[in-house]
Each structure stands twice: as structure tokens, then as C-alpha cells.
């Protein structure tokens, strides 16, 4: 799965940020991305394990991959629309 994280179109470093900042930054970044591009989010807030997948479901973007077994957490999302 780690290979999926090696070539994102965009990267967002949310290390040290706490809820709701990471999701707010993801939303702002995704808005500027063309459809189909990917965003790698790197975070250490435990709330992101719930918030990032929830954001993807609510906004109908694809959660391509996630690694949350150890810090830092990594999420790869693809903009769907």
C-alpha cells in the first residue's frame, strides 16, 4: 500500500494541527484541485482517523488509501467532482 502514497499530485502536511484544522485545510486544498487529482494528507491528530474518511463520504471524494496503524497517519484522496 505504501507505493500508493509515493506519487500524489498534491501533499498537505497537517502535523501538529488539531481538529477541526486538518479537515478545513483538506477542504480548502481539494477545492483548488482539478477532478481526478490526488491529495496526500499527513497528520498526527487521532480525530483524523474519523474525520478524513467522513469528509470523503460527505463530499463524495474517493478515499484511495489510508495508513493509521502508526504515526504519522497518511491518507490519499482523489477529487471526484
Curated annotation (Swiss-Prot):
Chain ranges passing through the membrane: none
Gene3D superfamilies the UniProt entry points to: TusA-like domain
UniProt keyword Cytoplasm present: yes
Keywords (A to Z) from UniProt: Cytoplasm, tRNA processing
CDD domains recorded: SirA (cd03423)
Pfam families from the UniProt entry: TusA (PF01206)
This protein's pathway: tRNA modification
Gene Ontology cellular-component annotations: cytoplasm
Keyword Lyase: no
Subcellular location: Cytoplasm
Listed InterPro entries: Sulphur_carrier_TusA, TusA-like, TusA-like_sf
Molecular function terms, GO-annotated: sulfur carrier activity
GO BP annotations listed: tRNA wobble position uridine thiolation
Active-site feature positions: 19
Known partners and oligomeric status: Interacts with IscS.
Family: Belongs to the sulfur carrier protein TusA family.
Listed name of the protein: Sulfur carrier protein TusA
Amino acid at each position: 500500500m505504501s507505493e500508493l502514497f509515493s506519487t500524489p499530485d498534491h501533499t498537505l502536511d497537517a502535523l501538529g494541527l488539531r481538529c477541526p484544522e486538518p479537515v478545513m485545510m483538506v477542504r480548502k486544498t481539494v477545492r483548488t484541485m482539478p477532478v481526478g487529482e490526488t491529495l496526500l494528507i499527513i497528520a498526527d491528530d487521532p480525530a483524523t482517523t474519523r474525520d478524513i474518511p467522513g469528509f470523503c463520504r460527505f463530499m463524495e471524494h474517493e478515499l484511495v488509501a489510508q495508513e493509521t496503524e502508526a504515526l504519522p497517519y497518511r491518507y490519499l484522496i482523489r477529487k471526484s467532482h
